Amino acid sequence: MPHFPPTPLTLHIATNADTLATWLIPAIAPVIKSHLVEINLLIEGEARTINRLKDGQAFGAISVQATPIKGCQLTRLGCVDYLLVASAEFSRHYFPNGICADSLKKAPGIAFDHKDNMHTRYIQQHFGLAQGECPLHAVRSSDAFVTMAKHGAAYCLVPKTQIKPELASGELVHICKEHIITETLYWHHWMLLKGVYKDVSDAIIAHAQAVLD
């Protein structure tokens, strides 16, 4: 039987929504089950999670930042491929002749929030459209991205691992196969972790390195 302290310990972890929707919970679930802890997940864009670690709100952060911050360590977790997807119906309606700059000016996309620049960077880099030239919903949920796309309400960038069943069934289609975004994730955390902090950190690293490329 696990030995529990008299009161739960709160662990604050900064993560992006895509990681939360895919592999983070399976990674930390064994530690949650074997220790009396309360997990507080601080959701930010993958480029901004590191700020929660810098200001002391979290003991660890999953981030795309490849350089360590003062007083912390980092470990490479792996790579995530992002695909631009939509429902077949949406694709036929907005992109009957393929995706292009003119069609993107009418087709609604999705971003996490107004600070999330992954979608706008992708559209600008590959189609030459600046921020504000395309309609864009703000939805702070990776699962809701997929739901909106499946209902034909928008197109979006999502991790390939999150939508394997939908791609296999044809419920979602990859609408821009020539351009894939690959993001490398890193785990930043306090130095010299002990106890359950180290257990959570080790679990995140081991699971991520097993499931990510």
Describe the predicted segments one by one:
Residues 45-46, 63-68, 87-88, 141, ...:
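Beta->alpha turn/N-cap motifs
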Residues 22-23, 52, 118-122, 165-166:
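Phosphate- and divalent-cation-binding pockets in alpha/beta enzyme and binding domains
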Residues 2-11, 102-106:
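Immediate post-signal peptide segment of exported/extracytoplasmic ligand-binding proteins
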Residues 6-70:
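Central regulatory/effector-binding core of bacterial HTH transcription factors
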Residues 48-50, 144-146, 163:
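Short, hydrophobic alpha-helical packing/hinge segments within bilobed ligand-binding/sensory domains
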Residues 74-81, 85-153, 168-179, 209-213:
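C-terminal regulatory
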Residues 59-63, 154-158, 175:
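Paired acidic/hydrophobic, glycine-rich loop segments that form the ligand-binding mouth/hinge
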Residues 23, 175-213:
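A late-sequence structural motif
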